[in-house]
């Protein structure tokens, strides 16, 4: 065998070895990726999981709205310029909020540990109640100033500020929103999902009684979104009713709304397990 043939044989052997090594490493990498992607698959959320998360989101929305309603019912007291100390403390407010929530859901927040609500909801409802009290606490000084006709604490400001406090603590998406034609606060501008849901709620056939919601699983099955509609009641019309365009106590133009029409919604987004 010539020297040239020997050299060619050695080179062929080295190439074969490199290919063999590369092949083995390629197989190892493929197996590793398969194990990573398929070996421990994330289980899909069950229908029961979805129902529990949806109910938790609904309860959060109802609780925030219960606080809004409590604030709305106390507007004459809060804005009474003839009185100093109104006695509308965070504790008094919380009792009213708890009572309204129980009336609407049957659940007593004072006995939440034994309440028949999803486990996920319990700490979140407790915290939302605390953040609601904090919002009212920040207004105590101005509420009790005599001679001032408008104190700034209305259902809308309560909802926006409390939602922001709760979201800062929990990372959970919670906000008020409204159709763009009724929007007063740009922070509450609806996203695409909210706009579509609000459009459904504006339809006269959408139920006005009970706690009917619009819900959808989003993010490829990773989250649940819930919208709770807010329909105008009689008390709302002092700011949002006729005559359209006239300034209300807050300085905004009235929308000319009628009782029972859609005023907005509370939007919640929770992750699925």
Q: Can you describe what each PLM-predicted range is?
A:
Residues 43-231, 245-273:
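Extracytoplasmic c-type cytochrome modules immediately beyond a signal peptide or single-pass transmembrane anchor
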Residues 18-19, 34, 42-47:
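Contiguous N-terminal and early-domain "leader" segments and peripheral loops that mark the onset or edge
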Residues 28-39:
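Bacterial N-terminal signal peptides
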Residues 12, 40-42, 242:
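Intrinsic-disorder/low-complexity coil detector
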Residues 232-244:
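The canonical Cys-X-X-Cys-His
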């Amino acid at each position: 065998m010539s020297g040239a043939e020997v050299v060619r044989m050695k080179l062929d052997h080295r190439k074969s070895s490199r290919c063999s090594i590369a092949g083995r490493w390629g197989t190892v990498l493929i197996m590793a990726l398969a194990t990573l992607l398929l070996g421990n698959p994330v289980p899909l959320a069950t229908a029961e999981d979805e129902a529990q998360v949806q109910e938790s989101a609904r309860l959060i929305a109802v609780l925030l709205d219960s606080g809004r309603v409590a604030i709305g019912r106390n507007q004459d007291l809060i804005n009474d310029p003839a009185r100093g100390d109104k006695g509308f403390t965070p504790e008094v407010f919380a009792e009213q909020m708890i009572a309204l929530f129980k009336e609407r859901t049957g659940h007593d927040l004072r006995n939440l540990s034994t309440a028949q609500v999803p486990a996920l909801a319990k700490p979140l409802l407790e915290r939302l109640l605390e953040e609601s009290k904090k919002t009212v606490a920040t207004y105590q000084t101005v509420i009790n100033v005599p001679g001032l006709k408008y104190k700034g604490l209305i259902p809308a400001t309560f909802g926006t500020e409390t939602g922001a406090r709760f979201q800062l603590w929990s990372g959970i998406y919670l906000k008020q929103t409204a159709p763009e034609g009724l929007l007063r606060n740009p922070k509450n501008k609806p996203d695409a999902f909210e706009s579509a849901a609000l459009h459904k709620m504006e339809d006269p056939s959408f139920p006005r009684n009970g706690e009917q919601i619009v819900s959808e699983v989003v993010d490829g099955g990773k989250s649940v979104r819930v919208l709770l509609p807010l329909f105008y009641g009689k008390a709302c019309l002092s700011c949002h009713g006729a005559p359209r365009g006239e300034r209300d106590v807050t300085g905004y133009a009235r929308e000319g709304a009628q009782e029972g029409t859609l005023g907005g919604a509370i939007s919640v987004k929770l992750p699925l397990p």
